[in-house]
């Protein structure tokens, strides 16, 4: 078994250098760590991309097949920590590979309805959930400026503020790169109303 077996690609496309690097790291972790080997053996990736985060830093976005997402979630905290050790100064983010089906036009003869999970809105919301995974999204607000620009303000759970706080810039840059939408992440300020 080699690192190439960790990559699921269509036969027409060749794996990139980043794909091979991430796959090799997954394979090395599987072979070196006995306690993680059982969890890592069935896991595969579809692709990996480096995204410019700002300030000269980069993040690695690892795309995984949709059916394997739950298996990745089981060991994601430890896997992310190990991969971030190997890729110094880069944040690692796991996102499921999803497909957006176009909205059927007036002249298209479709035989079945487009599933909700394949709409643009559903895919973008799912990407947002994947990016912040260990943390839960508590609320969202869409702010529209007078010049027409929209900014999504996402409120995250306060319990994970210490573990995720330093990654918020990476999260917003990756989401903007993948979807084209501006987003800011915040932790809600606790007020003393219940006292």
Curated annotation (Swiss-Prot):
- Name of the protein described by the UniProt record: Small ribosomal subunit protein eS7
Which GO cellular component does the record give, naming just one? cytosolic small ribosomal subunit
User: What coarse category fits the chief subcellular location reported for this protein?
Assistant: cytoplasm
Known partners and oligomeric status: Component of the small ribosomal subunit (SSU). Mature yeast ribosomes consist of a small (40S) and a large (60S) subunit. The 40S small subunit contains 1 molecule of ribosomal RNA (18S rRNA) and at least 33 different proteins. The large 60S subunit contains 3 rRNA molecules (25S, 5.8S and 5S rRNA) and at least 46 different proteins. Interacts with snoRNA U3. uS11 interacts with MPP10. Component of the ribosomal small subunit (SSU) processome composed of at least 40 protein subunits and snoRNA U3.
The organism's lineage is: Eukaryota, Fungi, Dikarya, Ascomycota, Taphrinomycotina
Swiss-Prot/TrEMBL GO biological process terms = cytoplasmic translation; ribosomal small subunit biogenesis; rRNA processing
Record-listed Phosphoserine modification sites: 172-173
Q: Where in the cell is it found?
A: Cytoplasm; Nucleus; Nucleus, Nucleolus
Q: Which family does it belong to?
A: Belongs to the eukaryotic ribosomal protein eS7 family.
The free-text function statement in the UniProt record for this protein reads: Component of the ribosome, a large ribonucleoprotein complex responsible for the synthesis of proteins in the cell. The small ribosomal subunit (SSU) binds messenger RNAs (mRNAs) and translates the encoded message by selecting cognate aminoacyl-transfer RNA (tRNA) molecules. The large subunit (LSU) contains the ribosomal catalytic site termed the peptidyl transferase center (PTC), which catalyzes the formation of peptide bonds, thereby polymerizing the amino acids delivered by tRNAs into a polypeptide chain.
Picking any one GO molecular function of the record gives: structural constituent of ribosome
Name the UniProt key words of this record, in alphabetical order: Cytoplasm, Nucleus, Phosphoprotein, Ribonucleoprotein, Ribosomal protein
Pfam families noted in UniProt = Ribosomal_S7e
Q: Where on the chain is Phosphothreonine found, per UniProt?
A: 146, 151
């Amino acid at each position: 078994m080699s690192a190439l077996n960790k990559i699921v690609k269509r036969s027409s496309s060749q794996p990139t250098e980043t794909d091979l690097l991430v796959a090799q790291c997954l394979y090395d972790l599987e072979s070196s760590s006995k306690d993680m080997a059982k969890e890592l053996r069935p896991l595969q990736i579809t692709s990996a991309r480096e995204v410019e985060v700002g300030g000269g830093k980069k993040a690695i976005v690892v795309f995984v097949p949709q059916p394997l997402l739950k298996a990745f979630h089981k060991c994601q905290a430890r896997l992310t920590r190990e991969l971030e050790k190997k890729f110094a100064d880069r944040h690692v983010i796991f996102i499921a590979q999803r497909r957006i089906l176009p909205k059927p036009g007036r002249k298209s003869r479709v035989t079945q309805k487009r599933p909700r999970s394949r709409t643009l809105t559903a895919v973008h919301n799912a990407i947002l959930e994947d990016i912040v995974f260990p943390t839960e999204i508590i609320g969202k607000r869409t702010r529209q400026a007078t010049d027409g620009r929209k900014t999504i303000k996402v409120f995250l759970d306060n319990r994970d503020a210490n573990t995720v706080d330093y990654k918020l810039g990476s999260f917003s840059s990756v989401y903007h790169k993948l979807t084209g939408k501006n987003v800011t992440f915040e932790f809600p300020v606790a007020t003393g109303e219940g006292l």
